[in-house]
């Protein structure tokens, strides 16, 4: 029996078969590793790669394209460069380097790519923001007008910081720079400020100690720690501050307040210098690349106080699509960059750069630190250029002459060493100055509420401590505040609620202080 094959049947069967066939092929833009070493890879191909784009190397090593040259791409590796070898295939990912953001990041310790390293499981968040983003333009900003209290008397009285400000903490190693930053973070408890601590090039043990301190004071509830330790590759140390800024921008653009501490930017500059030299970029002063100023300025300009107008805020330049539906006005991002100086040399390249970018600096001096003045702030060259507008009225009133009084005291102190015959006025000035220095001393991790600071500084500047012996000033301060809490809590409450020191409140405070000085001196003599 012969079967005839009809051509139309064959073609219809083939058509059906072809219609059901789906192409599984994926198209990748790939390149080849020409050379690898010191955390840098030269890749041939990838002609469509973008600057800052993530690249996928074998063995799950990620990299980022930094140098886009005529015949190759210079990429930095975020993983172990021994895992990558010559001839390996590199894939473009098509996405720019980004970091996960959101409330789920609070209380966690992560690396600069947002990968948790605290052993508390994965971070549940869908929103990712790019590491690099243009700073908000002038029309989207508002001038700094709200205070960000550090809890440190010397800073809140003479070098006030406002929300949205950039205040540099600068000093030699071991002068208490990190302690000032941590005190500020601890003092934000209950104030609705989210904190980000970025550790760059620190020892792993130091970071563990910082996390431990924050946990002990209940500060990790509203804090994220982003860390690239000294043993991490230089590219991770280079991008760590940008990851901190991206997370801070999430809170800023959703109408909340954030504080980011970069500890410290000297190490980031060193990591960037290392990458730039390995990528054969031309060196400049101190062998740093020519754009090291731009590295820090584009980072610190992202700290801002955003306008209250939501409609204007929604039109913000470079606003990522993921954030657009959540935008609220009135948020702020405050930056506290830290810079380490060598032997107090603030005129070196990186310190002068960052001083010129920021809105003021807190200068910590090793001589003051060693003489027992802690925090070791040199009031003479420390300044806050915009914080004055954010200071509460009460503090402005009581601390108005404090800086001048201290400056005069330092000058007289230097002269008094040469002569013993001092007139009455000079002696009185020296005595008061010594007491002012004493009341500005403060222990580590014991930030003080602003109303208590106002009460103590009021006593110092009004001369109410002149009858208390210098060595007893700290004890007097403790006991006086305890007495205020017990018998005159309404005075502190009034300052806290109104932010001002009314004449009647000041009168009652003065009266209470005068009575207490007599009682205290009698007790000391006894």
Curated annotation (Swiss-Prot):
PROSITE patterns referenced in this protein's UniProt entry, alphabetically: ATPASE_ALPHA_BETA (PS00152)
Main localization (coarse): membrane
Keyword Ion transport set for record: yes
Catalytic activity, reaction form: ATP + H2O + 4 H(+)(in) = ADP + phosphate + 5 H(+)(out)
Enzyme class: translocase
Gene Ontology, cellular component aspect: plasma membrane; proton-transporting ATP synthase complex
Keywords: ATP synthesis, ATP-binding, Cell inner membrane, Cell membrane, CF(1), Hydrogen ion transport, Ion transport, Membrane, Nucleotide-binding, Translocase, Transport
EC code: 7.1.2.2
Gene3D superfamilies on file: 2.40.30.20, ATP synthase alpha/beta chain, C-terminal domain, P-loop containing nucleotide triphosphate hydrolases
Family annotation (SUPFAM superfamilies): C-terminal domain of alpha and beta subunits of F1 ATP synthase, N-terminal domain of alpha and beta subunits of F1 ATP synthase, P-loop containing nucleoside triphosphate hydrolases
Topology class, membrane: Peripheral membrane protein
Domain of life: Bacteria
Residues marked Required for activity (site): 382
Sites where the protein binds ATP: 171-178
GO-annotated molecular function: ADP binding; ATP binding; proton-transporting ATP synthase activity, rotational mechanism
Subunit-structure text: F-type ATPases have 2 components, CF(1) - the catalytic core - and CF(0) - the membrane proton channel. CF(1) has five subunits: alpha(3), beta(3), gamma(1), delta(1), epsilon(1). CF(0) has four main subunits: a(1), b(1), b'(1) and c(9-12).
Functional note: Produces ATP from ADP in the presence of a proton gradient across the membrane. The alpha chain is a regulatory subunit.
Family to which this protein belongs: Belongs to the ATPase alpha/beta chains family.
Protein name: ATP synthase subunit alpha 2
């Amino acid at each position: 029996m012969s079967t005839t094959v009809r051509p139309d049947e064959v073609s219809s069967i083939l058509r059906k078969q072809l219609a059901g066939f789906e192409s599984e092929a994926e198209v990748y833009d790939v390149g080849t590793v020409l050379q690898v070493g010191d955390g840098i890879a030269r890749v041939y191909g990838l002609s469509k790669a973008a600057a800052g784009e993530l690249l996928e190397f074998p063995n799950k090593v990620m990299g980022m394209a930094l140098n886009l040259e005529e015949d190759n791409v210079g990429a930095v590796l975020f993983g172990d460069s021994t895992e990558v070898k010559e001839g390996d295939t590199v894939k473009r990912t098509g996405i720019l380097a980004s970091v996960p953001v959101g409330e789920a990041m609070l209380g966690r310790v992560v690396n600069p790519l947002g990968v948790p390293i605290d052993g508390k499981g994965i971070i549940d968040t869908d929103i990712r923001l790019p590491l690099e983003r243009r700073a908000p333009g002038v029309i989207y900003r508002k001038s700094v007008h709200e205070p960000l209290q550090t809890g440190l008397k010397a800073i809140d009285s003479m070098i006030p910081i406002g929300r949205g400000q950039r205040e540099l903490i600068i000093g030699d190693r071991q002068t208490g720079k990190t302690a000032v930053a941590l005190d500020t973070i601890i003092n934000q408890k209950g104030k609705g400020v989210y904190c980000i601590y970025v550790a760059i090039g620190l020892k792993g043990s130091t970071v563990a100690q910082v996390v431990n301190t924050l946990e002990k004071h209940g500060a990790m509830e509203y804090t994220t720690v982003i860390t690239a330790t000294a043993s991490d590759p230089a590219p991770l140390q280079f991008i760590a501050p940008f990851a901190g800024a991206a997370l801070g921008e999430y809170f800023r653009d959703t109408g909340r307040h954030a504080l980011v501490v970069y500890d410290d930017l000297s190490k980031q500059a060193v990591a960037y210098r290392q990458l730039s030299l390995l990528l054969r970029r031309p060196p400049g002063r101190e062998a740093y690349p020519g754009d090291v100023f731009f590295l820090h300025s584009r980072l610190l300009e992202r700290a801002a106080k955003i306008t209250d107008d939501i409609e204007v805020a929604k039109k913000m330049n470079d606003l990522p699509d993921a954030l657009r539906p959540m935008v609220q006005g009135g948020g702020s991002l405050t930056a506290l960059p830290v810079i380490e100086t060598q032997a107090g040399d603030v005129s070196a390249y990186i310190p002068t750069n960052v001083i010129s970018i920021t809105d003021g600096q807190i200068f910590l001096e090793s001589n003051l630190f060693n003489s027992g003045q802690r925090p070791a702030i040199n009031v003479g060259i420390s300044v806050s250029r915009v914080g004055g507008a954010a200071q509460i009225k009460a503090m402005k009133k009581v601390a108005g002459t404090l800086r001048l009084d201290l400056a005069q005291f330092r000058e007289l102190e230097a002269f008094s060493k040469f002569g013993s015959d001092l007139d009455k006025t000079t002696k009185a000035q020296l005595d008061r100055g010594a007491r002012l220095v004493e009341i500005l001393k403060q222990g580590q991790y014991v930030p003080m509420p602003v109303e208590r600071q106002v009460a103590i500084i009021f006593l110092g500047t009004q001369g109410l401590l002149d009858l208390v012996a210098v060595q007893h000033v700290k004890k007097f301060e403790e006991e006086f505040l305890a007495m205020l809490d017990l018998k005159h809590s309404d005075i502190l409450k009034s300052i806290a609620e109104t932010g001002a020191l009314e004449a009647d409140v000041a009168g009652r405070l003065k009266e209470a202080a005068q009575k207490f000085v007599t009682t205290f001196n009698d007790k000391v003599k006894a």
